[in-house]
Amino acid sequence: LQRQLGVPILLSGGQVYEDTGAEAKIAKRVLMSLGVPEEKILTETKSINTSQNARFSAEILRENGLSHPILVTSAFHMKRSVLNFQKQGVAVEPFPTDYLVAHHPVFHYTKLRPQTEALLDNVTVLQETLRTFVTRYIE
């Protein structure tokens, strides 16, 4: 879309962990290496969680006169992300990525064995469900 329409890209994410850089700055370097012009990349580097991503991104969108943004994030995280943008008064067009799907969706008895990956996926789902509840009803 950026190449075809020349629209800007807003990257959101600060330095979440002490031993890394700001997520938006890292992503900006990747986009530039893929040929996206630097002047078409906006960055928000203060946020450390989804609520802040939405709040600080909404400010940048308004400052730059941008409306109708396309929100790109992991599919499991999309519902809560959209809620956070709605709380900021920004209607986004969701574009989920990074779906978690089975590689071989055929039943086999070995799939009944406990697997570490499945446990981690369950933890992710539970965390996201709880965070969505908090976003919707408490924050």
Model-predicted segments: where are they?
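Short, surface-exposed alpha-helical recognition segments that flank or form part
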Residues: 45-49, 117-124
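A structural signal for short, hydrophobic/glycine-enriched beta-strand patches
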Residues: 1-112
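Long helical/loop segments within the catalytic core of UDP-sugar-dependent glycosyltransferases
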Residues: 104-121, 131
